[in-house]
Amino acid sequence: MRIFFRTALFLSFIIFCSSELHSTHIRAGEIIAKRISSTSLTYEFTIIGYTDTGSEVEFGGGKFDFGDGNIIDVLDESALSAQKILLENQVALNLFKVIHTFQAPGRYVVSYFEQNRNAQIVNMENSVDTPFFIETEILIDPFFGLNNTPVLLIPPIDNGIVGIRY
């Protein structure tokens, strides 16, 4: 019996140590594209992520895809600035700015992908294992002038309650 408990304890320890830890934290996000100059194809991209402040995992460990074949890690040195602003209701706004120049006019789907979405989202099955993904589309056309994406003026954070009209 003693050998059984030791074996069970040993196996439990091995399983616990080999499992990958995922702390969930991402609630919402957006990508803002702002063309810097009318004479170049250079854009300033702002990636905004809204996170739970109770998590020790920082936002920004994902991949940012410019839609032209260039993909960067948001936490690497290509980010011009990184900022974290504490909001109310245990929510933080995480902001990263990146500059990118496109090679030619065209339509580009710009996206951001990261693991660790927050758990217990009622209208989404298995939200904790569903990666966080946001995208926006920009059209660079010399006849349209400067093309910027819309900017959300109110953070997309709701505190809904099941069964109660919001």
Protein language model features and the residues they cover:
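Bacterial Sec-dependent N-terminal signal peptides
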Residues: M1-R27
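Long, compositionally biased, intrinsically disordered segments
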Residues: L21-Y166
